[in-house]
């Protein structure tokens, strides 16, 4: 039996594992007024990215293909900005945003899974960052504050756009639009249609035209599109009723 097991290990070596998400220190109990403490957990729709898979988002080469600085530049994230990330998951991009806006800025990290938000709070505590507020949203309302300079949905729209309720994502985007300043920007980053790369399988990738259609129905207009080969693309939206800056 031992010989058979050893032979199987030689013939079928283990696939190289993605790094596990870092272990962060335990958190003190959040204050009663914390943004997500008083909210009820949202009812998940479709297949959600679970906490057990967060290691997939921590690949050492992610910064190379995700292009966080270029994305933040495109949606106007600067020192002192007030921004939000929807579907923040493990907080990889939340960390990028928090470092960019600095101590005078504020990042609202939204997710519909409480466990994700707890992980983000631990991560920010470990990084000694105090400019991040977690927000427990729903599939149709991210519960964001008004006056945002920018909002970001990074590699998560394909999970928000579900067949069970096709209007939920339109309602979600409409609520984002209401939270933006007149000249605020929404960036949506998702996986280039087709196969390959670290993203979801081809059938779960979203054609950018589908996103543009949903955003238009939500009162947003496309301002710019940029492709970041080989894995992702970026769509930048503004409020359709916003008056141009003089």
Describe the function of each predicted region.
Residues 79-80, 103-105, 180-186:
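Short glycine-dipeptide loop
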Residues 83, 151-152:
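Hydrophobic beta-strand segment of the Class I
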Residues 117, 185-212:
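Conserved class I S-adenosyl-L-methionine
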Residues 98-99, 167-185:
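A short glycine-rich, Lys/Arg-flanked "PGG" loop and its adjoining helix->strand segment in the class I
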Residues 84-142:
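Class I SAM-dependent methyltransferase SAM/SAH-binding core
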Residues 140-151:
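A short acidic, Gly/Pro-enriched loop at the edge of an enzyme's catalytic core
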Residues 33-84, 92, 118-122:
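Class I SAM-dependent transferase core
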Residues 221-224, 228-246:
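Core SAM-dependent methyltransferase catalytic element
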